[in-house]
Amino acid sequence: LVWLVAKNKEEIIKDVSIDDDAIKGDPDAPVTIVEFSDYQCPFCATFYKNILPQIQEQYIDTGIAKLVYRDFPLGGHAHAQKAAEASECAGEQGKFWEYHDILFENQDDWETVGTGKFKEYAGTLELDSETFDACLDGGEMADEVRADFLAGRNYGVTGTPYFFIDGRPLSGAQPFSEFSALIDKCVEGGDSCLIDL
């Protein structure tokens, strides 16, 4: 495992696509963090609750970095695919991040029941329920979610959460210091963030 992590750090993908996925922060921020995540993954929830707030405060809110969320629902999580579709349906009504947040904040509540809760959350966010239900029930975002998943596979993503910081992979809900060290290197400019830390 140690060898795989070390090897992974050397595999740099300079052009990780952000597709048309949701962006948190200034779209023109100099550093791009692409997150491949699964709403039902407990480690993804840990990242959301414990690490993302620090990244948000220090890098996103200050215009240094932007976060792009891409779906990577794992097969072992029964409701992950539909949760991802639900967030994309909410995004169609301009509330992707609000829905993203409600899914992670309430992961324990919906992970065994799924769709009924997804519709309830849409109501909580005052989304147009008819439009949301049609989107979710009709699988309108299934291809979008699948495209993210396949892109992640092509980039070597095997689990969640998985990040690319200006193309540099970082796997798992790492401590904030790991993100900070890599982002700071990228802020220095040029290829500095492509060098081993």
Stretches with model-predicted labels:
Residues 15-31, 59:
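A short beta-strand-turn-helix
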Residues 1-11:
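Hydrophobic single-pass membrane-insertion segments
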Residues 42, 72-76, 105-110, 169-170:
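Short histidine/acidic/glycine/proline-rich micro-motifs that form metal-
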Residues 1-3, 36-38, 48-52, 57, ...:
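C-terminal cap of thioredoxin/glutaredoxin-like
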Residues 29-32, 62-66, 93-98, 125-131, ...:
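Loop/turn elements at helix/coil->beta-strand transitions in domains of secreted/extracellular proteins
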